[in-house]
Amino acid sequence: MTQRKFPRYLHQHVKTILGREPSDEEQSLLLRWVEFDKQRRFSQILTTGEGTGAPVSLANLFRSKGSVTLDDLGEVMGRVANDLIASGVTPHMLSLYCRTPRPDKRGVRTTVNRTAKAAGDEPVSFGFTDYPFSSCIVAASSGDQISEEPSKEATDGDAVILLHSPSGEGLMTPLLQELGDVDKCIIKVRVEGTDLSTQAVRLTKLLQMGVYLNGKSLIVVGQKAFIVVCRNGSENKIRKMARKHNVSASLVGRISKDKTYRISGDDISLPLSCFSLFDSEEVVPSDIRTPDELMHQSGITLNKIKQPKSFNSTFLVILGTEECVVASQLAAALPGSSISISAKDHMVWCDPKRGAQATVAAAVRGIVSGGVAPMHAAVSVHLPERLTENVQYRFREIAEGVSTSTTAFQLSINSVRVWFSENIASPLLTVAVSGLSDSVAPELTAGFKDVGDFILMLGSHRGELGCSVYARLKLSSADGPVPMVDLAMERQMREIVLTGNKVGLIKSVIHLSAGGLAATVAHALICGGTGLGARIHVSSKIRNDELLFGETEGLTIISVAEESIIEIERLCMNSGVPCTAIGRVTDNGIFTFNDLLKVKVKKLHESQKESRKKIFG
């Protein structure tokens, strides 16, 4: 990263604070700090929670070239768990989201298989994009709610110790867990990057205390390191604990009460106020104009697509796409997961604000479909290294979309990570949502259960084809408009699903996903009992392809016993949610949809099996 020139007006401010000319070393440190602190300032735009710890956290693994190794994946999974442990949270669930180019690109299948293997029994999902990088993997971990314990305050003379584990995150985990029970341990902070001197600035700002660093101890370290502040006199105990776990522990400084940052051997002595001079700089200017590509989107031209009498062949092609294979895989995942991770890159590109809303909503649906009530969110944004006006505008819109949707769902965003990379051209958003499972309620699954059950559609099907799989296949483009996201309606549907499940009314639930209504019903059949079929009949004024393949956001399909219909309809009516009976579960092993589709369920299984083999090998 190119270091910018020290601004003249800030030079004057620093000179006024110091009562002297700042040294070259001090100016260099201040400039390194402002670049280092850029992540925090961008993150603050997205953060709504309070406190240093969070019940959900994120870590990232980015590769511009080549496939990832199992060791790489193990490190990113260990990193996200250790970050939670350091904040006082016990991790109990982990999820991975893997972005790669489409599977026909070299090395993609290797990365996909290794990611699935590394995840083991933990939930993992995949997104296939047309971006040029090799892979972008985000790990999310959730844990128990932080107990309301009074925070410990640092005092003059407390030791600053660097814990470093060159051999990997795994060695750090038991040490961090043990340090959590040490009363004399004040705070544990991850070392971000390799410049320990700038990381120490972050520590002083967190503690609002000064620090005196040993210049000879400011070694270059990797990201497998933490700074620990402990009570004066407990250094040997910490070293002994670290040695037991094969982690190096070095005393790098002391906390001081005078709120001054000093490094021995260097010409650096700065009051903490100097490091706040950049805080007034506007991170994202408010007067940036809308980029041309967002102002002039052409949308979908449906009259170019001919309407056949039967959609069987088109349906099977759609069901075999990467998007639908991943959706089916997620539908078949173990129920009751307390964490869900989502990304909708193409939607975010076409409409950053609405795409961000759709991303949050999808993460919420991911755990609601298992009967889990969403509570917390973590947000990850990858930004290009070069922050053009276009990128800044898109980030601002993403932040607005995340804010409106998390507010609507009453989620607390208490973990935000912003990363910068020279290998991407546009922001990438990833959202993880964690929640609390009701131990009394039965676990919900996606598959249809019993012959004769009614299939109900919650919400209004608008048949939107913008950003859809169908549009990509038929028009070689999946551009906007991005489907509307009705946050108020989604919140009501969430409560219906959770309440209906708690009282035993709902047998299965699946949210409309890639491929539209036809593909979603197919996923419920693939995940359902042997020999089952489905007879669907929907009256609609929209086009047949919109009805079958339109990807309306938030639409939910549930199955219920006949005796439960009246109670479910009453729940929906009281909440203002449209509820429509669209079909029944049959025993003939055939999926019919109006007179447009008639496919054996056995054929659906075969199509998915062949497509999974192409993607996963």
For each predicted feature, which ranges?
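Glycine-/charge-enriched secondary-structure boundary and capping motifs
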Residues: 2-29, 108-135, 176-303, 391, ...
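Glycine-rich phosphate/pyrophosphate-binding loop regions near the starts of catalytic domains
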Residues: 12, 19, 25-167, 213-219, ...
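Catalytic-loop motifs flanking and including active-site residues across diverse enzymes
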Residues: 73-76, 171, 196, 356-359, ...
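Active-site glycine-rich loop that binds ribose-phosphate moieties when present
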Residues: 144-148, 169-175, 491-493
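Short, contiguous, pocket-lining structural segments
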Residues: 167, 171, 192, 489, ...
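Charged, low-complexity, helix-prone segments enriched in Lys/Glu/Asp/Gln
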Residues: 335-337, 358, 362-366, 376-378, ...
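Long, low-charge, small-residue-enriched segments that form tightly packed helices used
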Residues: 481, 485-487
